[in-house]
Amino acid sequence: MLLIDIKDKELSQEEVEILEHPLVSGLILFSRNFHDKVQLEALVKSIRQRVKKPLLITVDQEGGRVQRFREGFTKLPAMQAFHTLAKNPQESTALARQTGWLMAAEMFALDIDLSFAPVLDLGHQCKAIGDRSFGENPDAMLPIAEAFIDGMREMGMATTGKHFPGHGHVLADSHLETPFDDRPKEAIFNRDILPFKQLISKGKLSAVMPAHVIYTQCDSQPASGSEYWLKQVLRNQLNFNGVIFSDDLGMKGAGFMGNFVERSEKAIHAGCDLLLLCNEPEGVIQVLDGLKYQPTKTQTERHISLMKRKTVRWNELEASPRYQQAQQRLTALQNEWLEYKAQHC
């Protein structure tokens, strides 16, 4: 039910006990949990061995500025780089697929189950999204996003489309406040929701993460706590039957829904299967003590479906010609992107 974080680069006994709580299903790792590849491998191994139940271990390893593990890992390009710098659509989709495959391979080699990717938000108006987006035009960005997903799926990693139904057209950052999107319903359904709709119809999304955004012309609650968005639209209209993650309930944008227990209750009632609660250790304890909920059999099955099913050895990965070629090209692309941004932004 809950995905939480840990404080540092080693696992404390107190954290072991919290992770063994029946309501905790997994954890998300951050840059503060990472020093180098050797340390990270030891940390993940410690989690797997000391916590006496299967845990979903996750990270945000999108690429560009949202890449928690850097030293010793491939410098992944920002998603906007594919469309902007590629010579033609064929090259942009090939690069995106390489990135999805390589990212998933590197995570599996460290025994990490999934990276929360890809971002399917349109546009770069929101600073929290920016170049994390594949583009502003749904028709142009969809093949690139789908190629990235196909790369992840080839490696066997579950995919998470975020931030439903679209976070790209608000100025506010939901890490800091609750954003309001005042556009007409038709604008959202005719543009922002299209990448989610089409990828769901093709069976390409294992999970969806809703936004902490209030779409004022549609509902009074943030999408992450909205029955309208999660049950009526996502489940019933789009026929999505995968996992629904809440975005981090510790973010300021979730504060609209009340205290931590109330946020969790509203997210569950709205339709979320797994809840992220990060950077709020006291909030985690409050939820574990105060949340009266037993995950359903369906929710448990959805949770298990996200776990890694392929073993990748780092030395074998590094020796692979495909990996070597992809790493070289993608590192160069991200360097090109940083130069491009320096000149044009």
Curated annotation (Swiss-Prot):
GO molecular function: beta-N-acetylhexosaminidase activity
List of residues binding substrate: D60, R68, R132, K162, H163
Protein's UniProt keywords contain Cell division: yes
Pathway terms, separated by semicolons: Cell wall biogenesis; peptidoglycan recycling
InterPro entries for the chain: Beta_hexosaminidase_bac (IPR022956), Glyco_hydro_3_AS (IPR019800), Glyco_hydro_3_N (IPR001764), Glyco_hydro_3_N_sf (IPR036962), Glycoside_hydrolase_SF (IPR017853), NagZ_Beta-hexosaminidase (IPR050226)
Enzyme Commission identifier(s): 3.2.1.52
Broad class of where this protein is predominantly found: cytoplasm
GO biological process: carbohydrate metabolic process; cell division; cell wall organization; peptidoglycan biosynthetic process; peptidoglycan turnover; regulation of cell shape
Active site: H175 (proton donor/acceptor), D247 (nucleophile)
Function text: Plays a role in peptidoglycan recycling by cleaving the terminal beta-1,4-linked N-acetylglucosamine (GlcNAc) from peptide-linked peptidoglycan fragments, giving rise to free GlcNAc, anhydro-N-acetylmuramic acid and anhydro-N-acetylmuramic acid-linked peptides.
Protein name, UniProt field: Beta-hexosaminidase
